[in-house]
From Swiss-Prot:
PANTHER family xrefs: UPF0260 PROTEIN YCGN (PTHR37421:SF1)
Family: Belongs to the UPF0260 family.
Organism classification: Bacteria, Pseudomonadati, Pseudomonadota, Gammaproteobacteria, Enterobacterales
Pfam families assigned to the protein according to its UniProt record, in alphabetical order: CxxCxxCC
HAMAP family in alphabetical order: UPF0260
Name used for this protein in its record: UPF0260 protein YcgN
Coiled coil ranges: none
């Protein structure tokens, strides 16, 4: 029987979210862009509605922020997901690695940490590149409310 050393086990399987380095934490993000879609909240019920309206800093084709390191200078309301506030974002998709690992679940087979690229994620249509429109092209965000996506269940 072959022995497995701790270094053979991927960091996300041997460390808790709190034990991860900042670089490991950042690498958990699959880059789907779902966090970068604007959400609307009903003022009376606090229900969150998902839109296909992407932040103006999101490159929709690559699903990457144009200014990730300086994003708060460009978008002061951009979210910063941390170990401390992870559970404040109940709307995180069911496919989100942060959510999955916090719930004790494995990463999906298409995750870039497992496949080495984002191609499988895009192929599974997990990313927003197939549905997103840039906020600069939208007049009324309410016209862009999506039926609750399956990833929001």
């Amino acid at each position: 029987m072959a022995e497995t050393s701790m270094s053979d086990i991927p960091f996300w399987q041997r460390k808790t979210l709190d034990e991860m380095t900042d670089a490991e934490w950042e690498s958990l993000c699959d880059g789907c862009g779902q966090c970068c879609l604007h959400k609307l909240m009903d003022e009376d019920t606090d229900e969150i509605y998902f839109t296909n309206v992407a932040c103006r800093q999101l490159n929709i084709k690559t699903c990457q922020c144009r200014h990730y390191e300086r994003r708060f200078e460009f978008e002061p309301d951009c979210i910063k997901l941390t170990r401390e506030n992870l559970f404040d974002f109940a709307w995180l998709p069911m496919t989100c690695a942060y959510r999955l690992l916090a719930e004790g679940k494995p990463l999906p087979a298409w995750h870039p940490l497992l496949t080495g690229s984002k191609a499988a994620m895009h192929g599974e249509r997990i990313s927003v590149r197939h549905i997103a429109v840039n906020e600069s092209e939208v007049r009324d965000w309410q016209d862009h409310i999506l039926n609750k996506p399956s990833w929001a269940d």
